[in-house]
Each structure stands twice: as structure tokens, then as C-alpha cells.
């Protein structure tokens, strides 16, 4: 990542463990260290869970400014809203944040509460491998190779997943936490019969060492074998053997300044490091598992109105401070990296007799010690709250010694930081969606973690939910588009995270999970919202690298392996579409026919990506590229219609192939039913790749309440299909993500009424669920219209915020995929938009939402035009396809 990247703040909600605030430790950036402050309010002698970010834990995101100078969450102590705590973090200065906790007692009884503040220095793993070598020895990680190759090529050889260098994997038992070998999942390409590195004759790795003055040098190699037998290699003509070892072991090979290890195919192996050392000192190389330096020196001063605790760490430049504002402060310690190892009733009792937090109350249970680590626990005990009142506590969290302030001064910091954090100002018709969309907005913004490793550095990453500690290609595009509703800068940050320039030989975009290339629609939406297109031009060549991979033209891509215009990403992940249990996909895996099967969604998405790149190229004057995009679009559009259409069902189908790559038909059930009746089967309409009667049939399927248009929205699977069931993950559920693609497509087709129906049903269902539970779920059951799976999910549910803004938030301009805007100039009661139309549908719709306080008149290139006012202030313009663009002007009607 280069210096022109947008920077994230060093303080933020970055913990992967417990909700609170974290500080990134810059001096330990190579280790990925962060400092966590976690806050746990609880009723005395209760079972309120600690704020574990990976499981339901009673807290709900409530508010967040897009610069992270203020955010808050609600902690339920007695459901629902009987007793709760509103916890916020307010930036005081560059080195300090104020934690404010207001506990509300809405019961008729007095309450006794406790406030726990936990502080911990966190690393990706609590232990690491310390390597010591003799003075003058040369130590090199195995990943510092000149070249690394497999005799049998992997489809991902030049598109390595998870931001890794080729062959690299993460493992705390290895030096620097990284090893070299083959740990990429490959069960989805079982037909390639891939073997671990070293188990295939001809696997190679090359190294080069600088000149040195070591008298009798040899090379110590730390390794482990991953199959039975000894691993045997040719080393520049000499045979070297690495004896079988299930544990990491050291072998010694002859010294050569440059050499290649070429496998004889005897056993699989993983390498850790190489060390050039004098033979007489080889036994002085040691590898020890050491605890990370997470233990602090603790100094506490008792003040008139609280405690100040100083936590000093050997490897951190400056100490951390916790300053409370209540004389009823105590402190405890937990010798564990897992707060759940502490008994919940000990955490909720502030008496000193309960300070042995892991001590059980019965010999029937053992002490728990799940992880190594250490938490310092400042607690404010015996917070008495009268009925129907609230109580506020302030705690300053700092890396410079804070001064104790008055409650009034603390409150002023809070109020100042909170400015500008108000929810979106919807028009009256949309006000009922305020709470549910604000919770989702806050979830999207705070689902951000550190560290995630990306090609040599640890980065801050916006994740679908904090239970996923990794990149996610298709989720990230939706995260970025959700962030765009509040912060174009954060959208750009998320997008640029996933793109690469041509200096990266290990991958041309970040790949993890289903390869649904949502970065293209993310780029399009960001460009349309950005009037200065040149400021984002640097992303074009990066996006083009990505696109060329999707066409099978760079980085050894196999996406175009059928050589007929149909495209598949099944060589890169078991799911091409993100719909894990989509029936055709499940059946393909059961048949083990991935090699001979091609879905439709990948081709459709890549056609749409080509159309987007064509629009961007036109804007930037990259006219030579347009011809390439046009040829690609025509080639794949024809292939879909010639090879994948099933007239009998009126859906497109998974094409199946023989050994020679010839299409033999489409995938069917034993009874002859098209196995692709569902989202994949209608996806060519998203690409604009189907016309006439075929398009009509697809629209009928999507709109039919007995097929795809369920009571909860658009079903992933046709409900009349023999393979539909109502309790799957995607099968039987409605997700917002692919439904968003259909919604945009309805705008492309001038289907404004149905587009609104999609958005309105989703918003109402989301409101009912989130207003009731305060949770933001992944999907909604068709049978129940209730949310399910992960509870603090952002990612693929981001379209909820997009729909709410599109129809109810003034100054929001929305189009389908086929409309490009050169600029969007808006106020609450006016708009001036220059646009171009690139599609070929009979009609298309644009939505411009302005204030509901006035009446409007509209002009296209100076000529007055009609529009539909969907809701007061939400104006829909449906144009004939012959309208290729112009300047749309909307003004207050003075008549």
C-alpha cells in the first residue's frame, strides 16, 4: 500500500475480541499489535456477558461518526430497555479518548451496577517463535526466495488468496509468524490432484545469499514434513534430504550462495527459515516459543475522585493510562487472554473477596485458561441508581498522563465530539426507518479490525462482521457502497484495499471467498458520486488489471478455460456466487463435476464489469480500451444466449461439458428439471445480456409470488422448484445483496414500480426486525420474515442504507448500471445532473430525492419534463432509450 492511500485513524473500534476502543501500536506495526480498552457494564450479581465481538453479547452499535472521533453502542442489562447502558468514545486529543457510560434504570426498583474497564496489549497470537543465531550468521525467512514454483500449476499461482505472497501461510509456530509451503485450500479443484509442495517431482524454490566472511559456512534449514517419508531435493546437482519430522526441525545442507532446491517428489514439506552459519556454531541456533510482551508494570494512584492507573510495557514507547472519575474505583487482574475465563458472577461483584476471577465455586468445575494473555481490570463498583433515573460515569483512556477534570468538563468533551453524529435526516415518509438504518450504519462503520495481513504489512480492514478475521472479496464491494452513503473517503479506502497495480506479481486484486467482482459496481457508484473524476483516475488501471484477470488474460487466470465466452471462477473457490447452498452448486459438488460445469452468474457479472469499464474509459478518454470491452461484451452475451438458455423452464442453466470442452447440455435433476431455477438462472438480465421474450420470461419469474417474489423479497431459489427448501442458508432466505443487483436492473429497465416494491419490502422487514432486536442480520427467512445468522452484520446487508437514502434522503441521486453521471450538483431543493445513457433497454429510470418541503419542476436540456413523485420529495424520471443523456435540472416550482 503506497503513501497516496487514505489513512485510517490510529484510535478506533479495531478489536477482534471485545468491543471498546483500540490504539494501533505503530512501533510494533510489524507484529500487528494493538492496545484494547473494553468496557463491560453489568448489574450486581448478574450474568451480563462481556462484549465479545464474535457472538451475541447484549451490546448493539448505536452511532458512529465517519471519522471515528465519536461512536457509541447500547448495552442491554435488562431486556428490553428496562436497564441499559449507553457507552460512547469521544476523541479528547490525539492521545486520548473519553469513555462515557450512562446507565438508565427504567424500572420501578433501585439498581446496583458495576462498570468494568479491561485493558490489554493484544497481538495476533499470544506466543511467537524467537529465533537466536550466532553473531555474524545470516538469517533469512523461507519466504525471502528468488523464485518459488510448482511442477503442477495452481490456478491461483499468480492470484494468491488472502493478500499473501506465493506459497506464504500464517502460523505462529514459524519465524515471524509465516511459513512457506502449500496451505491454500484446493478441495474445490480435486480434479487437479494437487499434492503438497515437495511431494510432486519438479517443485522448486530458489535462494540467493549475499557474500559473507563465514569460514566454514553451512545452511541450517528449519522445516517440517507434511506427508510420510523423507523429503528429497536436488540442490544444484547434489541430493539433500530432509528427514521426516512432524514437528519443526533443523536440517543442514551445503552452503551455496545461489541455489535451487528441486524436489524429487518423495514427501511434502514446509520451510520456515534458512540460516548461513559457521559449521562449528550450528548448535547455537535456537528456536523457542515465547510469550508476547503483554504483561505491564502497573502503578496506581488514588485521587480524590477516582484512580489513575499507569500501564507500562517494555516494547511500547509510551505508557497507557486509565483515569476514573469515581472514588469507588478498585482494580483486579485476569491472567488470561479470554475474559470468558472469568466467572461471570465474579465480574459482576465488586467485592474484594471475588477478585480471584477464574476461581470456581465448586470442585465440580476446573479453572479455565483458554488463551495466554493478561487483562488489567479497573472497576467502579456499587453504582446505585434510583428508579427511572440515569447515572453517568467518565473514564479517560490515554497514552499521555491525563489531568482529572470536572464532570462538567468531561461532559463538554462528549458533547463536542458528538456534534455532527445525528442520524440521517430523512423526509417524513422515511422517518420510521431512522433507528434501524442508523444501527446498520454504525455497524458498517465499526465492523473494522486490525491487524489483517496484506502483502507485507498489517492493515485496518472493514469486515462483514467481526467474527470474520479475513478479507472478503464480494462482501467488500457492498461494504464500500454502504460506506459511500456516509463517507466517499471510506468507500475509496475500502475499494483501493482490494485493487493492485502491475508491480504486484503475487495477485492483481485481493481474493478471498466467492469471486463476485463487486469492486466494479463499487467503483462505478463512487465515480458517479464524485464530480472530480480525475481524482479517481488512478484506480482505472488497477481495475483494468482485475478485469483482464476475469477475462482470462493475465496472472495465469483460468476464468475463460472453456474458450467459448462463458466464464467460471470455480477454480478459485467452491462458490462462484456467494450463495453457499445454492442447489445447482451443491449438486455440482456432490457430482464432483466442477471441471465440467459453468454457471451463469460469473459471466453476467463480468459482462457488467466490462460495461462499467467502458463507461469509465469513455469518461477518461481511454478510447482504445472501449473496443476491447465491446468485443468482450458481445462475445459473452452471445455465448450465454446460444449455450445456456433453457427454453423449457425459461431460465438460463449451468452448462455441462465433455472431456473435449464441448457443451453437452445444461444441468438437470433426475426428472429433467433445470437445476438453475433461481438467482443464477436469471442473472443475465443484470448484465443487460438478454432481450425480447427471454427477458420477459425472466421478469415473470422474478415477479411471480409463487416463484421468486416471496413475502420476504426475492428468493435465491425459485420456490416452485423441487429443490427449494425453507431452512437453508441462502435456500429459503432472502439476502439484500443479489436483490440489490436486481433492483438496479429494474431501474435499467424502467421498472420503477417493482424497483420500489423491492426496496420498500426490504426496508419494512429490516425495520421490524432491527427495531425489535437492535440486531443487523445477514438474511431473512421466507417462512418467518425474521433475521438470521450473524447478529452484528454489515457487509451484504448494506443495501438497506442505500435504499433508505435513495427514496428518503434529500440530495440523493440514484440510477441503474447503464447511466453515467458526469456531475451531480444538489442542494436540499434543487439538482443539476449531467448524465449519459449507455444501455439498450426500452426505457430506464433515475431517482432524485430532494426535500419534501416544496414542489418541483424539472427540465431536460431546458425542456420541461414530467416525473413521478414516488414519495413526497422522491422524484422518478423514466426516459425512453432514445434519450441518450443531457442535463437534468430540478428546481422549486414557484407557481
What residue spans do the PLM features occupy?
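Structural helix-adjacent loops and short alpha-helical linkers that scaffold large soluble proteins
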Residues: 427-433, 467-469, 483-496, 527-544, ...
Amino acid at each position: 500500500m503506497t503513501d497516496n492511500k487514505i489513512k485510517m485513524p490510529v484510535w478506533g473500534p479495531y478489536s477482534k475480541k471485545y468491543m471498546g476502543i483500540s490504539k494501533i501500536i505503530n512501533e510494533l506495526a510489524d507484529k500487528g499489535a494493538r492496545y484494547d480498552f473494553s468496557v463491560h457494564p453489568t448489574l450486581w450479581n448478574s450474568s451480563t456477558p462481556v462484549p465479545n465481538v464474535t457472538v451475541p453479547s447484549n451490546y448493539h452499535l448505536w452511532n458512529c461518526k465517519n471519522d471515528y472521533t465519536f461512536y457509541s453502542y447500547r448495552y442491554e442489562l435488562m431486556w428490553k430497555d428496562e436497564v441499559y447502558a449507553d457507552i460512547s468514545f469521544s476523541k479528547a486529543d490525539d492521545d486520548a479518548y473519553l469513555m462515557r457510560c450512562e446507565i438508565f434504570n427504567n424500572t420501578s426498583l433501585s439498581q446496583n451496577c458495576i462498570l468494568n474497564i479491561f485493558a490489554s496489549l493484544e497481538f495476533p497470537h499470544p506466543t511467537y517463535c524467537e529465533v537466536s543465531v550466532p553473531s555474524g550468521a545470516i538469517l533469512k525467512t523461507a519466504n525471502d526466495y528468488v523464485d518459488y514454483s510448482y511442477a503442477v500449476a495452481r490456478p491461483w499461482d499468480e492470484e494468491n488468496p488472502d493478500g499473501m505472497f506465493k506459497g506464504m501461510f500464517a502460523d505462529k509456530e514459524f519465524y515471524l509468524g509465516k511459513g512457506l509451503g502449500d496451505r491454500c485450500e484446493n478441495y474445490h479443484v480435486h480434479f487437479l490432484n494437487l499434492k503438497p509442495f515437495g511431494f510432486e517431482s519438479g517443485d522448486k524454490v530458489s535462494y540467493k545469499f549475499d557474500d559473507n566472511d563465514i569460514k566454514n559456512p553451512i545452511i541450517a534449514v528449519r522445516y517440517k514434513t507434511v506427508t510420510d517419508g523423507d523429503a528429497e531435493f536436488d540442490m544444484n546437482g547434489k541430493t539433500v534430504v530432509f528427514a521426516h519430522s512432524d514437528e519443526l526441525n533443523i536440517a543442514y545442507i551445503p552452503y551455496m550462495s545461489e541455489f535451487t532446491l528441486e524436489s524429487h517428489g518423495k514427501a511434502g514439506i514446509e520451510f520456515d527459515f534458512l540460516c548461513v552459519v559457521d559449521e562449528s556454531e550450528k548448535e547455537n541456533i535456537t528456536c523457542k516459543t515465547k510469550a508476547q510482551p503483554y504483561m505491564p508494570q502497573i502503578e496506581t494512584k488514588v485521587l480524590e475522585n477516582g484512580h489513575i492507573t499507569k500501564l507500562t510495557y517494555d516494547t511500547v514507547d509510551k505508557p497507557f493510562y486509565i483515569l476514573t472519575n469515581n472514588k469507588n474505583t478498585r482494580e483486579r487482574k485476569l491472567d488470561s487472554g479470554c475474559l470468558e475465563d472469568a466467572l461471570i458472577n465474579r465480574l459482576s461483584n465488586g467485592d474484594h473477596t471475588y477478585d480471584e476471577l477464574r476461581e470456581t465455586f465448586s470442585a465440580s468445575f476446573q479453572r479455565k485458561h483458554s488463551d495466554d494473555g493478561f487483562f488489567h481490570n479497573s472497576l467502579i463498583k456499587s453504582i446505585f441508581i434510583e428508579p427511572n433515573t440515569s447515572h453517568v460515569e467518565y473514564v479517560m483512556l490515554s497514552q499521555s498522563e491525563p489531568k482529572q477534570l470536572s464532570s462538567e468538563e468531561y461532559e463538554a468533551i462528549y458533547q463536542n465530539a458528538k456534534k455532527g453524529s445525528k442520524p440521517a435526516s430523512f423526509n417524513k415518509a422515511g422517518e420510521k426507518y431512522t433507528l434501524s438504518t442508523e444501527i446498520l450504519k454504525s455497524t458498517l462503520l465499526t465492523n473494522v479490525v486490525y491487524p489483517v495481513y496484506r502483502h507485507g504489512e498489517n492493515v485496518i480492514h472493514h469486515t462483514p462482521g467481526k467474527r470474520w478475521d479475513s478479507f472478503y472479496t464480494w462482501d467488500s464491494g457492498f461494504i464500500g457502497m454502504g460506506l459511500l452513503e456516509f463517507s466517499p473517503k471510506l468507500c475509496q479506502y475500502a475499494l483501493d484495499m482490494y485493487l493492485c497495480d502491475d508491480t504486484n506479481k503475487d495477485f492483481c486484486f485481493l481474493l478471498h471467498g466467492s469471486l463476485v467482482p463487486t469492486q466494479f459496481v463499487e467503483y462505478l457508484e463512487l465515480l458517479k458520486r464524485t464530480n472530480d473524476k480525475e481524482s479517481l483516475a488512478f484506480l482505472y488501471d488497477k481495475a483494468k488489471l482485475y478485469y483482464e484477470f476475469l477475462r482470462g488474460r493475465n496472472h495465469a487466470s483460468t476464468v475463460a478455460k472453456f474458450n467459448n465466452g462463458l466464464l467460471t471462477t470455480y477454480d478459485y473457490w467452491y462458490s462462484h456466487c456467494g450463495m453457499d447452498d445454492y442447489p445447482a452448486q451443491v449438486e455440482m459438488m456432490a457430482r464432483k463435476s466442477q471441471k465440467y460445469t459453468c454457471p451463469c452468474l460469473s459471466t453476467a457479472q463480468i459482462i457488467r464489469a466490462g460495461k462499467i469499464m467502458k463507461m469509465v474509459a469513455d469518461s477518461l478518454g481511454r478510447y482504445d480500451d472501449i473496443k476491447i470491452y465491446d468485443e468482450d461484451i458481445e462475445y459473452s452475451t452471445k455465448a450465454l444466449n446460444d449455450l445456456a438458455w433453457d427454453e423449457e423452464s425459461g431460465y438460463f442453466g449451468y452448462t455441462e461439458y465433455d472431456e473435449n470442452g464441448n457443451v453437452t447440455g445444461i444441468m438437470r435433476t433426475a426428472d429433467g428439471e433445470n437445476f438453475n431455477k433461481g438467482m443464477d438462472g436469471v442473472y443475465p438480465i443484470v448484465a443487460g445480456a438478454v432481450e425480447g421474450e427471454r427477458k420477459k420470461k425472466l421478469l415473470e419469474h422474478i415477479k411471480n409470488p409463487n416463484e421468486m417474489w416471496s413475502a420476504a423479497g426475492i428468493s435465491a431459489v425459485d420456490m416452485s422448484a423441487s429443490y427449494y427448501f425453507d431452512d437453508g442458508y441462502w435456500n429459503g432466505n432472502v439476502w439484500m445483496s443479489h436483490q440489490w443487483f436486481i433492483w438496479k436492473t429494474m431501474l435499467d429497465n424502467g421498472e420503477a414500480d417493482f424497483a420500489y416494491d423491492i426496496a420498500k419490502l426490504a426496508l419494512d422487514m429490516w425495520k421490524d426486525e432491527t427495531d425489535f432486536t437492535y440486531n443487523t442480520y445477514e438474511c431473512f427467512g421466507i417462512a418467518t420474515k425474521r433475521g438470521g445468522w450473524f447478529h452484528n452484520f454489515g457487509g451484504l446487508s448494506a443495501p438497506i442504507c442505500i435504499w433508505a437514502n435513495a427514496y428518503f434522503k434529500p440530495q440523493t441521486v440514484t440510477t441503474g448500471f447503464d447511466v453515467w453521471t458526469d456531475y451531480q450538483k444538489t442542494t436540499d431543493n434543487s439538482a443539476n445532473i449531467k448524465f449519459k445513457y449507455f444501455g439498450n433497454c426500452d426505457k430506464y429510470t433515475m431517482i432524485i430525492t430532494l426535500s419534501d418541503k416544496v414542489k418541483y419542476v424539472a427540465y431536460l436540456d431546458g425542456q420541461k419534463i414530467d416525473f413521478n413523485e414516488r414519495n413526497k420529495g422522491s422524484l422518478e424520471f423514466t426516459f425512453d432509450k432514445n434519450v441518450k443523456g443531457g442535463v437534468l435540472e430540478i428546481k422549486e416550482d414557484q407557481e
